[in-house]
Amino acid sequence: MAATARPARPRAGQLVIIGGAEDKLRHRTILNRFITLAGGPEARILIVSTASSLGEEATDLYAQLFRQLGAAEVVSMRPLIREEANSPRAAELIKDATAVFLTGGNQLRLASVVGGTRLGRAVVDGHRRGLVVAGTSAGASAMASHMVAFGAGGATPKQRMTQMSAGLGLLPGVVIDQHFEQRNRIGRLLALVALSPGLLGIGIDEDTAAVVGHSGVLEVIGKGSVTILDPAKLQTDAYEAKRYRPIMVSGVILHSLPSGYRFDLRRRQLRANLRPVDATDRELAAVNAATERTRRLIRRIAAEGADDTAPERARRRASRSQPLEEASE
């Protein structure tokens, strides 16, 4: 009896992890890549804007952009409570989509509302079968299994300068931070990998994206750089540092990768670089179509989540009015 061939396992879809404030008016390199990966003229995009405080404004802007860039269909949803994310309609929308786009805003809101629901599971299962998933700013942080919940900026890693929680689980083994250079987040990413040395730290600048394929190779596109922190040979005193004191971090390998460079996340190795992508005349001409209202909205979207140190400040004010003691979190 002849042996029957096993059906080929579906390949996971690509992830487009954007550091926020991606170019929406001129080159639009990152958004163009997303549409291409999603199917170009056959792309069917689902926008999930749960993270954003701007609601329909942010959704409508991205819908307009994706249609301008050639997507065949764009639909959206904004579940604000877990019951909405658990609705059958949420999972059905994923089945009809070729790609999902997670907007920026507050990643803790996104993960708290969507994580572990029908919608969250449908995104993860769809990605395993080839669904392309992109996230910008807060949407980028939420894509990993481990997520930066909130924290303070600064170059020096300190105890308790940030907190980590569960993300959506699309990319295991990493923790992702965004607006990386612009909001000076190197210190908190160092603190995170010092506390969790099994994870790679990935920091993505604004208007920059890490495109991760099914093979686990990350490609950098856009204007800035992607910083990768590998703590495999880490030495630290993080387990001894008290409260908000600086912690010692040594032996972390730092990779700073501009556009065109690639990194193998599984082997933790740099790969041969690619040629950076140039803008087309069509992309450059698009800037003339932008209205001043659109420009203002783009600035507001880029600023979402900028003040994520509020929980930290509140905790410090409370600690000044109480006797010193070891706090638990």
Which residues are covered by each model-predicted region?
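C-terminal and late-domain segments of enzyme folds
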Residues: 1-41, 47, 53-68, 147-149, ...
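Structural recognition of the beta-strand scaffold that forms the well-ordered cores
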Residues: 16-17, 46-48, 75-76, 99-102, ...
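Catalytic nucleophile loop
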Residues: 101-104, 123-147
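Short, structured patches in soluble enzyme cores that scaffold and shape functional sites
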Residues: 78, 104, 125-127, 172-180
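Glycine/threonine-rich flexible loop motifs
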Residues: 107-117
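Portal/gating segments that form or line small-molecule/metal binding sites
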Residues: 46, 52-96, 102, 109
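Catalytic-core regions built around general acid/base machinery
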Residues: 92-96, 116-130
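Short gly/pro/ser/thr-enriched loop/turn and capping motifs at secondary-structure boundaries
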Residues: 108-109, 140-143, 227-228
